Each structure stands twice: as C-alpha cells, then as structure tokens.
Amino acid sequence: MKNSKSKFLNFVKKNPLFKNFYYFYNIYIRNYKFLNNGSQFGEEKFILSFFNKAHKGKFVDIGCFHPTRHNNTYKMYKSGWRGINIDLNSLTIDLFNFARPKDININAAISDNEENKTLYFVDELNTQNTLEANHLLFLKNHHNLKNEEISKLKIRTKRLDKILDSYNYNDIDFMNIDVEGHELNILNSIDFLKYKIRFICIEMIDHNDQAKLINEKLNEILERNGYILEKKIDFNFIFKKINYDKKN
C-alpha cells in the first residue's frame, strides 16, 4: 500500500496537470471538514483570545504537517496573520504553497546544528516521520508501527535562527513546535534575548523515562527564559511570556 501511494505521489509531482488537481482534492475535498476547524483541540482559538480581532500577527510553525488539517495557524492565516511554515516533508510544503501562498513555506528539517541526520520516514503527509529513535519507540508501541513501514533516510538539518534571520523574524506572536520528539533540539537553538516570542505551543509526550527527562528540560528552558505554562491541551503545552498583555 505504501509503495503504491508513493508511486502515485511521484507521478502526480511530475505531471503538472495532475499536481494542482491533487492539491485541490487533498485540501478542499478529502479534508474539507477541517476548513473551518483549524487546530485539533482548540489551541488556535485559545491563542487568538489574547489578541484583538484586528491584530495581524506573525507566527512560526515548525512541523506544520498540513495547511488546514489539525493546523494551529490556519485560522490565524484566514484572519490576516502571516508566518513561516517549516516541515521536512516536501509534499507538505507543496500543499502550503498551494493553499497558503501568502505565507513563507520552507521544506527543511530543523535542529540545533547543521548536520546529516537519520530520518525515520514512514510516508509523505505522515505525522509519524521523526528524527528521534526514542520517539520511534513510542510510535511502534502506541501506533503499532511496524519495522517494514519505516525507511531510514539521510537528511541535512538546518538551524532555525538562520531561517528567522533571513526573513527578519525577530518579533513573533506565536510559535508552534511539533516535531515528533525533536523539540528540545529546536528550543536549545533559540536565542530568547534576540527573538521575542509571545506564545509557544509545544508537544510533549511522557511515553518513557527518556521522554520525561527531555520534557523536564523543555520546561526548565522556558521557565528560565521567562515563560509560564498558560494551558495544557491534550499533549500540547501552551506557554506565555511573562508580563505579556493583550496586543492591539
């Protein structure tokens, strides 16, 4: 099934006549029910409640997955916000370029160093693709992922600060980080004195002792840099910069 899907997607990408039709089908037909919902558990609605409706904010979404489905910035985009969407899946970025052309959409794997890493790849448009072997254990145990479903690929990582600097993104209203266990590497690469980030939503899953330790470090970094936990929604933790007030 995976090989058939991959062959189909490769065919679509190489044939412009089919490519746009597939993008339209994926967003507006197959995933039509998500066009009004935005985020999966209401994270986006909660974030937007801190801003006046007229505010046109800036966001950064790392591990953006899909432009509409279970996306924490889609309603922001529809409200006039603009941002940078980053994902290591090329098809994801193709869909963003189709559905959200006013955003900056980048195909990249983000980490704390620029180096070659192993990507545990399941499929295009799959939330289970990960750079972390420990997170792969979680996927196998909790999502019944089989070894034969996983391909090991080499991928070159990029640093987030280089991307932010290239687009002059120093003042950010909302940052979403959902990278399947690689969140600590990204947070470690952020200079919180240089980049003003008002809200950070980060996925944290305590699936084993190593993951718990990593999540403790995530909390320590955010607390040390002036953030408090504002709300927990499912596996997503929303942190707010202390002394932040509603913005016009």
Predicted stretch roles:
Residues 1-248:
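Phosphate/nucleotide-binding beta-alpha loop and adjacent structural elements of enzyme active sites
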